[in-house]
Amino acid sequence: MGAALTASPKVLACSSQMKQPVKKDEQLPLGLRVDHPNVNSLRVVGITDSNMTKDLDPASSWARQEELVVKQVVSENIDKLACSLAETEDPTNAWRTIFVKPSHKSWTETVIAIKTNHISRQHTRSAVMAKICHTFTDILGVRPSNIRIYDACHGSSVSKNTPFSDLPEGCRIENKWGGSSVYTSVPEPWKKGTGESKCLKYLVDGSVDILVNIAMCKGHSQRFGGFTMTMKNHFGTFSPRPGHSTDGMDYLIAINRTPEILGEMDKRTRKILFPRQQLCLVDALWASKGGPGGNPTHQPNFLAMGVLSPIVDYQVATKFRGERMGWQPNMKTTHRMLTDFGYDESDLPAGGKIIEL
């Protein structure tokens, strides 16, 4: 499980040079909306199904959860979520709508990075990870060795402590994948768009084509809204260090507005040319009010998906964690996940609700 992109060098060639800083007037403007080419970026879908697990054991370890998860039901439900997200009845069509390859590459050549969360004791369940990986290989035709699973901050022992089962043969668990090692520009609101921070090399140099964000559903500091899900998951893509200062929320918003996460921006129109982060999934089969450490406290048997990270986090934080579980977020902070990306509550579809199956 090497940290270097050693397989298929023609496909995965990387530049060793430092990325040139992006000028402030070439950054994504604060409040500018980001759209997926095929999917409503404001649509967040969810499903609750007790049949996804065999028994209740809310505070269980990851190993125990692996025994309890019913993989086939999880797989079928993720297909249902994809259909609802893409607004189609056929799972194959749904996945081909959600995932978009670069025009100059075949699916075989396309490089996928999957950000998992490996801090402390709550981690992605194998059934969820395997379903997404098999979607790429079995439906779209991605070469398994071009799928890379990582956590650049806390991922040194992913392959040892959470050896995801049933992955396509050749799929790579990269652990830290070299860590956050290359400086890149970070836009507003952090440091008024003049700052830089370290990021995963393969996002900075453009080696990765599609980024998938698989997050947990845990509590965290009120500074970040009182929770950690898909946006804060990228504290394991970018260096988390600046995020733990007084302007940490600015940093969290800002790194999720970078080309490294969102995709390359047209310097003239300041629009995203090709979306990089194309799916955000919250694995709340188990979840916790507090965090980020410790075992889960609850077993909601819930999954949620969307294509735009701040919208997914806002909806799951307010509608699922807040309204359903009673874990109210810090709304002053949480509302920025809408407004700093150009949206408001009134823009959300389905009366502002998660679209539940």
Tell me the role of every PLM-derived stretch.
Residues 18-111, 119, 123-357:
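Extended, low-polarity segments enriched in aliphatic/aromatic residues
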Residues 1-17:
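N-terminal export signals
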